[in-house]
């Protein structure tokens, strides 16, 4: 898998101009959702080299991350004359970069694309690393491919218009990166004043968080080994997310991951000895900022069934990423049903 270029922008217009120059193309398309079309696209439409770009807009939120939406993007590309040499720019959050990346990867067997993430979650996670896809049959990211963007352009000025819930959704992935990397990054994430955001310092933290993911992806682009470290919190988290969708009470991805981290740090303590004090500090931070996911023991079987569908599983066992210590990662860990119920 080719290595994508990730740029923490000083000037989005300059960085985008250079990224487009590196991708020779016959036609340019911009994919947005209803929110980014209104809030983010106007600042780019003034750029001269985008004046002829064809706009494609899809519904916002994860409920639109579907085969039907994907087909509508394919249809728009086809009807507007896209060829194998066209270029797609994805301007949006994780849903847009995931679905747009998959549309680009599959249209005419693959066209070039650029990601411009507009949410914190997309900046530190979804747009980086080459994973693309859609939800299917009630399961998160069930259909997709590894297809890295040619460039990922991170403009943290977009974060100034982000609401608190979407800020914390992305921050959960940053917290995960702190846990799997080093104590210093973990501490700065717990100590950061989320009530009075210093955006200059946040930009630096975003850079460090992205670097954690980039370093891991470069070692293991297709998730056969160490890249599974990035799944901390996601086995339980995806189960919470799928249950919430099934019950028509969708939750933001990062909130599900945060609740998944609570479960999987407890499992880490049980199985591999993750320190109780660091587990409690992290869980306290999550409880204060994310609350808790409402479910009861009657739903354990359903949550367990969702975990059994997780893509990381092998030979019928539920696979977890656990921690012995901050930065000391244990991949390919399993737990039996009783232990998983105790974790929940």
Show which residues each predicted segment covers.
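ATP/NTP phosphate-donor binding region
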Residues: 1-87
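Non-catalytic interfacial helical region
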Residues: 77-91, 98-115
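Generic secondary-structure signature for well-ordered alpha-helical cores
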Residues: 82, 148-151, 157-164, 172-184, ...
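Short glycine/serine/threonine-rich phosphate/pyrophosphate-binding segments
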Residues: 95-101, 123, 239
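A glycine/threonine-rich phosphate-anchoring loop and its flanking beta-alpha core
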Residues: 102-194
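Active-site segments that bind and position negatively charged phosphate/pyrophosphate groups
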Residues: 192-301
């Amino acid at each position: 898998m080719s290595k994508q270029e990730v740029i923490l922008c000083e000037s989005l217009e300059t960085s985008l101009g250079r990224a487009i120059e590196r991708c020779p193309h016959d036609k340019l398309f911009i994919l947005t959702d209803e929110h980014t079309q209104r809030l983010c696209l106007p600042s780019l439409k003034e750029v001269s080299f985008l004046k002829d770009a064809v706009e494609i807009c899809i519904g916002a939120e994860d409920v639109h991350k579907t085969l039907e939406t994907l087909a509508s993007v394919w249809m728009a590309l086809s009807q507007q004359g896209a060829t194998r040499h066209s270029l797609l720019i994805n301007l949006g959050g994780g849903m847009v970069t995931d679905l747009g990346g998959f549309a680009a990867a599959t249209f005419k067997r693959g066209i070039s694309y650029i990601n411009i993430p507009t949410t914190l979650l997309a900046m530190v996670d979804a747009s980086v690393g080459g994973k693309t896809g859609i939800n299917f049959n009630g399961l998160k990211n069930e259909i997709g491919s590894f297809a890295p963007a040619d460039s990922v352009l991170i403009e943290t000025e977009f974060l100034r218009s982000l609401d608190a819930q979407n800020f914390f959704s992305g921050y959960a992935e940053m917290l995960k990166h702190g846990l799997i990397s080093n104590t210093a990054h973990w501490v700065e994430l717990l100590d950061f004043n989320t009530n009075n955001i210093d955006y200059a310092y946040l930009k630096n933290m975003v850079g460090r968080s992205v670097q954690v993911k980039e370093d891991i992806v470069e070692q293991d682009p297709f998730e056969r080994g160490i890249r599974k470290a990035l799944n901390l919190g996601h086995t339980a988290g995806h189960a919470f997310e799928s249950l919430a969708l099934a019950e028509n009470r969708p939750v933001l991805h990062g909130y599900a991951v945060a609740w998944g981290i609570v479960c999987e740090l407890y499992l880490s303590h049980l199985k591999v000895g993750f320190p109780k004090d660091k587990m409690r500090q992290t869980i306290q931070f999550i409880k204060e900022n994310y609350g808790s996911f409402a479910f009861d023991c009657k739903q354990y079987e359903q949550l367990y069934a969702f975990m059994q569908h997780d893509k990381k599983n092998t030979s019928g066992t539920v696979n977890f990423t656990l921690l012995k210590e901050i930065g000391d990662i244990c991949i390919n860990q399993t737990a039996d049903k009783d232990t998983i119920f105790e974790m929940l």
